[in-house]
């Protein structure tokens, strides 16, 4: 069993999330929000003007569950990125450009693998 986050770590993560969201507020109305837990990875495209989620994908999808056995890894994040790109292509509006809202997650490992895969599929952020 992994130890819970300390109070100092939680405060640091909260500050990081606020700092990132404050910078993103002025950039675009459409943002790609990602969240990583120890077992799963989630991504959703959010339109802040409408207050609606346009598309979402995660490792909880049946297609991805086989790749992510017990913990989230870079390969599972790449599969989620391909699934997410397919869902974005299915939308009637052309969402090829948005900003990445990494929240309290640092841009390394799984988040970087997800972003690199989306960039290789032709998305800009």
From Swiss-Prot:
One cellular component term from this protein's GO annotations in UniProt: cytosolic large ribosomal subunit
Annotated Pfam families: Ribosomal_L18p (PF00861)
CDD domains per record: Ribosomal_L18_L5e (cd00432)
Superkingdom of origin organism: Bacteria
Keyword Cytoplasm part of the UniProt annotation: no
Keyword annotations from UniProtKB, A to Z: Ribonucleoprotein, Ribosomal protein, RNA-binding, rRNA-binding
Example GO molecular function: structural constituent of ribosome
A biological process term (GO) from this entry: translation
InterPro entries found in the cross-reference section: Ribosomal_uL18_bac-type (IPR004389), Ribosomal_uL18_bac/euk (IPR005484)
UniProt-listed HAMAP family: Ribosomal_uL18_B
Physiological role: This is one of the proteins that bind and probably mediate the attachment of the 5S RNA into the large ribosomal subunit, where it forms part of the central protuberance.
NCBIfam families to which the protein is assigned, alphabetical: L18_bact
Protein family according to the UniProt entry: Belongs to the universal ribosomal protein uL18 family.
Subunit structure: Part of the 50S ribosomal subunit; part of the 5S rRNA/L5/L18/L25 subcomplex. Contacts the 5S and 23S rRNAs.
Protein name as catalogued: Large ribosomal subunit protein uL18
């Amino acid at each position: 069993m992994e130890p819970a986050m300390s109070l100092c770590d939680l405060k640091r993560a909260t500050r990081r999330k606020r700092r990132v969201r404050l910078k993103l507020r002025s950039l675009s109305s459409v943002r790609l929000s990602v969240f990583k837990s120890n077992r799963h990875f989630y991504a959703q495209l959010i339109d802040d003007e409408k207050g609606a989620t346009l598309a979402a994908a995660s490792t909880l999808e049946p297609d991805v569950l086989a790749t992510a056995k017990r913990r989230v890894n870079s390969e599972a994040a790449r599969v989620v990125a391909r699934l997410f790109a397919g869902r974005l292509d299915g939308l009637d509006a052309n969402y090829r450009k948005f900003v990445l809202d990494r929240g309290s997650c640092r841009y390394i490992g799984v988040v970087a693998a997800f972003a690199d895969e989306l960039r290789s599929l032709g998305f800009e952020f």
